[in-house]
Amino acid sequence: MIEAEKATYTIKRMCELLEVSRSGYYKWRRARESGPSPTKARRAELDAKVAVFHKASDGVYGAPRILADLRAGGERVSRKTVAASLRRQGLAGISPRRFAPATTIGDLDAVVPKDLVGRRFDTGALNRVWTSDITYLRTAEGWLYLCAVRDGCSRRVIGWAIDEYMHTDLVEAALAMAVAMRGELAERVILHADRGCQYTSAQLARFASEHNLVRSVGRTAVCWDNAQAESFWAALKVEFYDRYLWPTKAAAKLAVGDWIERVYNRRRRHSAIAMMSPVNFEDRLTQTAQAA
């Protein structure tokens, strides 16, 4: 208002009428003419970048993973600063809930393998321990069952299969994908799972023997003995699957496969592997081995 009427009234008179100080008015005008301060400009720039990375993660990433994205782009910033930016913008990441053990149907007549892992899923090398499990996926057309196989070192999903029935063929299909991806295995690989009848079956025992896999299972009703596989389900359900409604089984199958390969394996940063994606982590391991 003062700016609009300064040709008619003196600045002093208008400040008196509006009950504002002249020093305050001149301070405001200098700030407007000089533009935002370097601090405010830097904050606005950071907020924009944080918002872009948050959106790119489908609203999943919080401060730790966005910090990794920023630093990968050359930004020198702290986790505390990133967290403050998220708060200013009303943004938040999604943290997986504590996982709950999935229902396991055991076979009382099966010969149960020993636990060869002892919760040490990551031995520091690829193709030493594979973990596997089965989970339920709800759709409007009924249930689907997803079996996944992950490398214990890189956390990469190397095999997966989805079907309407939870039988041994489902597990075998996921393992067949893993074997095809990894190629001929020079050493025996431990395949660790729970005591579900699919994993203790004679059918799977034959498949494992034919493909240089040695079976290992955890204790009954102790979900921590297969914690790495269970943590994958928590990420899948909380960060992706449970955020949407699935009208058809076909749509769910396509979307889950896309999320596993495009997001989880190639984009999602994992705190356990230096905030890298599983594929990038495997690439680094390969480069390190070749340089040695």
Model-derived features with residue positions:
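Charged DNA-binding/catalytic regions of mobile-element recombinases
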Residues: 1-292
